[in-house]
Regions:
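Conserved short "hinge" loops at termini or chain/domain junctions
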Residues: 1-65, 79, 83-87, 91-95, ...
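Short His/Asp/Glu-rich catalytic/ion-coordination signatures at enzyme active sites or charged loops
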Residues: 90-107
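Long, hydrophobic, well-ordered secondary-structure blocks that form the structural core
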Residues: 109-111
């Protein structure tokens, strides 16, 4: 499976330059998981293939890549401490662990926001993307806001 973005693009889009994260710390598997779990259900295989083939560069650059990068960071974040050689959980105080858990929750919220942003853009411009079917987008049927499940 060819990915829409590279590990370096994930780092450039979602990490601040001063971090210790390098391209080798974000794996192709992290990106593939993010695309399979969070992108494909929203855009579908046909639009994914079109974007991978180089079509719809504005959609890819402005909406898809930031969303995939955010989900990739969310997926990779718990593993980054290990990959960067930072001490394991038992070496942290409970407060440090709570801060790390809060950071992961923030990453999830940010990724969800970018997913919704991309979905809203696709819905508003669905005539421009022949491969996109809004009826297949799960965000058009169900969402969880503040712990409340909304089904439409």
């Amino acid at each position: 499976m060819n990915s829409i973005i590279t590990p370096q693009q994930v780092i450039d889009l979602i990490f601040i330059p001063e971090t210790l994260v390098t391209q080798s710390k974000i794996t192709a598997t992290d990106i593939a998981i993010a695309e399979s779990r969070y992108l494909l259900p929203i855009i579908g295989e046909a639009l994914y293939d079109a974007i991978s083939a180089g079509l719809y560069t504005e959609l890819r650059d402005e909406y898809v890549a930031p969303m995939v990068a955010a989900w990739t960071r969310y997926i990779a974040e718990p593993l980054l401490a290990e990959r960067l050689g930072i001490a394991q959980d038992k070496d942290y105080s409970e407060a440090d662990n709570d801060v790390r858990k809060d950071a992961v929750r923030r990453l999830r919220r940010n990724a969800q926001l970018l997913s919704r942003r991309m979905s809203d853009y696709l819905n508003a411009h669905s005539d421009n993307f022949a491969e996109y079917n809004p009826a297949d987008n799960p965000l058009n049927h169900c969402t969880i806001d503040g712990g409340i499940v909304q089904i439409f």
